[in-house]
């Protein structure tokens, strides 16, 4: 084997006769032998070099077979024009034949039988061309039908943008990974038979990112034209509709490259022309694109960030900087940059750190104009309290001296004075809330002046305002409102039947005091029926001027004239501290003759109306009940109780039978009965 290898290595040099043949074909005769030998050595070396480079390309492609494209790449590497026309989609299987002392490699072509071609049946006739209509959109929404493409979800957009090798087209999931060039030939030769080639011959599968061509349909082109014209046009109503469409439409994924290019080019042109209105419109387009939850903008941030940063730190954005409000555009663009950093900044791209360095560099420079200085401070302040604490607060003293030199010094330029005033207002606006959280109260102007220089007194006053505003907001958050809606409760006191007419005592309590419905029954021993006057009823109420709730005892005392005993039925309830007003209503009613015994009497109703105590408004918060244990040894257990009673008034008719009150707790009142009020 070693001898054969040495023999093959010795035969790799071309014979010198080949050089003579080539020279004769070119019209050069009588070439010397030494010249042919030198040419043979040089050509052999060049061929070996090209072959080695072609093998390198083959190994880099992870293939086991050398192709003509590898030879072409090797020739291009040597600055040699490659050979054209020797390309094939598949590997060409050359066959070897020898005879007559010669060796020949040839490509074996397939023999075709004409009878097979003639007898082959004709293919099916294709279908005729037809037109079919379907809805592109219904009231601005694309219907989910097979003819309409589904909108690409945000996850798929992110995967295509960040991991192109893992993303696949809709028809490639079933086919699996892309195949090498040799796999298709192996499958064709197998004719349906499953052949698994060795991995050394096939190579590892690889996937290339397909070239994405952003081709818009006619409808999308028309939509893009209308949207861009409306966003930068003069009609505010159309502009609002266009921005709303950009912020909510889920089918703008294919038009994102156009929109980002439109915004970046528009900012570049209008900054040179100092067109403030168009710059504002373009920034509103950026805001609408970022508000759309279905769009993934990370692939286009490299175009949007320079456009937004230009509107922040540009030296001049309008024709009249002393009159036009370009400060609002800088503030709006600074908020956009902060939103971009919040959504797209990662540890890989470091968007926020790079933007922070840009703002800091332009702010620290002594030659920076006041407009650029304002934009840099606004951009840093919108990035959060940590950036303010780290980068802005340490430079407040230097910036305050620069502002004071412009405001208090000789008037050099009105634009500089206006810019310094805006920078001072911006610093006070953003630094005061941070200082209110960092520094403990109280706030001393001398301490602020010593730490922050000329801005110290103004900062101190703004910090005091920030503390007061924060306390007011906390008080508003902690304030609670309790609304209780309950039906009006009714307390009915009834007694068992006794000799003589008896009437139940009815106590009405307002709906603001939640009293449970309770029924008290006082049983007495039976006595011979005899006419007797109506009993006297007393309601003992306790009132207190304090704000706390108390426990009140309602006692019903009934005394009969013919007996020496008194029955007391206490009812304990917890109500808020109120000052009651007792109203005595005397009512004369007529009962059916079959149920009422002979005799005359009157009904006395005590209506208790609770009012707030003296010094308490109507809108005060309700008091929480704090029950106090009552004493059962006295009808009036609480100090300061008021005994409310009334004189008996004779009625025109006997009272109704006991135990038959109205359903709503009221008794029928005659038209002629007096109603005195206490």
From Swiss-Prot:
Molecular function terms, GO-annotated: aryl hydrocarbon receptor binding; DNA binding; protein heterodimerization activity; RNA polymerase II general transcription initiation factor activity
Cellular localisation: Nucleus
Keywords recorded for this protein, A-Z: Isopeptide bond, Methylation, Nucleus, Phosphoprotein, Transcription, Transcription regulation, Ubl conjugation
Modified residues (Phosphothreonine): 120, 248, 660
Positions with biased composition (Low complexity): 542-574, 633-646
Covalent link (Glycyl lysine isopeptide (Lys-Gly) (interchain with G-Cter in SUMO2)) residue numbers: 196
Segments for region (Disordered): 142-201, 524-574, 611-678
Database matches in SMART domains: TAF
UniProt-listed GO biological process terms: mRNA transcription by RNA polymerase II; negative regulation of cell cycle; positive regulation of DNA-templated transcription; positive regulation of transcription initiation by RNA polymerase II; regulation of DNA repair; regulation of transcription by RNA polymerase II; RNA polymerase II preinitiation complex assembly
Primary location: nucleus
Coiled coil: none
Pro residues bias locations: 622-632
Chain positions found as Omega-N-methylarginine: 524
Residues that bear Phosphotyrosine: 253
Gene Ontology cellular-component annotations: cytosol; MLL1 complex; nucleus; SAGA complex; SLIK (SAGA-like) complex; transcription factor TFIID complex; transcription factor TFTC complex
Sequence positions bearing Phosphoserine: 264, 626, 634, 636, 653
Subunit note: Component of the TFIID basal transcription factor complex, composed of TATA-box-binding protein TBP, and a number of TBP-associated factors (TAFs), including TAF1, TAF2, TAF3, TAF4, TAF5, TAF6, TAF7, TAF8, TAF9, TAF10, TAF11, TAF12 and TAF13. Interacts directly with TBP, TAF1/TAFII250, TAF9/TAFII31 and TAF12/TAFII20. The TAF6/TAFII70-TAF9/TAFII31 heterodimer forms an octamer complex with the TAF4B/TFII105-TAF12/TFIID20 heterodimer.
Similarity annotation: Belongs to the TAF6 family.
Functional summary from the UniProt entry: The TFIID basal transcription factor complex plays a major role in the initiation of RNA polymerase II (Pol II)-dependent transcription. TFIID recognizes and binds promoters with or without a TATA box via its subunit TBP, a TATA-box-binding protein, and promotes assembly of the pre-initiation complex (PIC). The TFIID complex consists of TBP and TBP-associated factors (TAFs), including TAF1, TAF2, TAF3, TAF4, TAF5, TAF6, TAF7, TAF8, TAF9, TAF10, TAF11, TAF12 and TAF13. The TFIID complex structure can be divided into 3 modules TFIID-A, TFIID-B, and TFIID-C.
Protein name: Transcription initiation factor TFIID subunit 6
Encoding gene per record: Taf6
């Amino acid at each position: 084997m070693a001898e054969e290898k040495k023999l093959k290595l010795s035969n790799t040099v071309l014979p010198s006769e080949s050089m003579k043949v080539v020279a004769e074909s070119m019209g050069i005769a009588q070439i010397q032998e030494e010249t042919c030998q030198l040419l043979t050595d040089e050509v052999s070396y060049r061929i070996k070099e090209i072959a080695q480079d072609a093998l390198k390309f083959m190994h880099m492609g992870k293939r086991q077979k050398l192709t003509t494209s590898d030879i072409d790449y090797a020739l291009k590497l040597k600055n040699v024009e490659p050979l054209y026309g020797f390309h094939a989609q598949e590997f060409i299987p050359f066959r070897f034949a020898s005879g007559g002392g010669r060796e020949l490699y040839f490509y074996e072509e397939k023999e075709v039988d004409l009878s097979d071609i003639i007898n082959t049946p004709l293919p099916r006739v294709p279908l005729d061309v037809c037109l079919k209509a379907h809805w592109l959109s219904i009231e601005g929404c694309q219907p989910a039908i097979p003819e309409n493409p589904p909108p690409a979800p945000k996850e798929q957009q992110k995967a295509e943008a960040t991991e192109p090798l893992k993303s696949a087209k809709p028809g490639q999931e079933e086919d699996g990974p892309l195949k090498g060039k040799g796999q298709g030939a192996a499958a064709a030769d197998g004719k349906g038979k499953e052949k698994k080639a060795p991995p050394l011959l096939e190579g590892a599968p690889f996937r290339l990112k397909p070239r994405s061509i952003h081709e818009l349909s006619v409808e999308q082109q028309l939509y893009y034209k209308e949207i861009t014209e409306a966003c930068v046009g003069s009609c505010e109503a159309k502009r609002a509709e266009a921005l709303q469409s950009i912020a909510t439409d889920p089918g703008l994924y294919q038009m994102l490259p156009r929109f980002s290019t439109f915004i970046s080019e528009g900012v570049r042109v209008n900054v040179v022309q100092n067109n403030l209105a168009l710059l504002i419109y373009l920034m509103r387009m950026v805001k609408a694109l970022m508000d759309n939850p279905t769009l993934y903008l990370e692939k286009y941030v490299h175009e949007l960030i320079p456009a937004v940063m230009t509107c922040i730190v540009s030296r001049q954005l309008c024709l009249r900087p002393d009159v036009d409000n370009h400060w609002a555009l800088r503030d709006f663009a600074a908020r956009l940059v902060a939103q971009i950093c919040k959504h797209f900044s990662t540890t890989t791209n470091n968007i926020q750190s790079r933007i922070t360095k840009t703002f800091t560099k332009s702010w620290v420079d002594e030659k920076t104009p006041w407009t650029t200085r304002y934009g840099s401070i606004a951009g840093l302040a919108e990035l959060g309290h940590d950036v303010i604490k780290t980068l802005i607060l340490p430079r407040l003293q230097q910036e305050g001296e620069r502002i004071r030199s412009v405001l208090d010094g000789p008037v050099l330029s009105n634009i500089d004075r206006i810019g310094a005033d805006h920078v001072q207002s911006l610093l006070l606006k953003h630094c005061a809330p941070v200082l209110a959280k960092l520094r403990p109260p109280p706030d001393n102007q001398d301490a602020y002046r010593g730490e922050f220089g000329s801005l110290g007194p103004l900062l101190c006053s703004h910090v005091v305002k920030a503390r007061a505003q924060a306390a007011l907001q906390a008080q508003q958050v902690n304030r609670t409102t309790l609304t209780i809606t309950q039906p009006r409760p009714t307390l009915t006191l009834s007694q068992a039947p006794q000799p003589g007419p008896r009437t139940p005592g009815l106590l009405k309590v307002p709906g603001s005091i939640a009293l449970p419905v309770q029924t008290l029954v006082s049983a007495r021993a039976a006595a011979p029926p005899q006419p007797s006057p109506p009993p006297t009823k007393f309601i003992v109420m306790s009132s207190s001027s304090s704000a706390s709730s108390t426990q009140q005892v309602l006692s019903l005392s009934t005394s009969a004239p013919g007996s020496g005993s008194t029955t007391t039925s206490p009812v304990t309830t917890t109500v808020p501290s109120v000052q009651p007003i007792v109203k005595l209503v005397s009512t004369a009613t007529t009962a059916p003759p079959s149920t009422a015994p002979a005799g005359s009497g009157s009904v006395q109703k005590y209506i208790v109306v609770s009012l707030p105590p003296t010094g308490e408004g109507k809108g005060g918060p309700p008091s929480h009940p704090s029950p106090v244990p009552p004493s059962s040894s006295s009808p009036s257990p609480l100090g300061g109780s008021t005994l409310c009673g009334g004189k008996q008034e004779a009625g025109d008719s006997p009272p109704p039978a006991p135990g038959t009150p109205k359903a709503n707790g009221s008794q029928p009142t005659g038209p002629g009965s007096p109603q005195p009020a206490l």
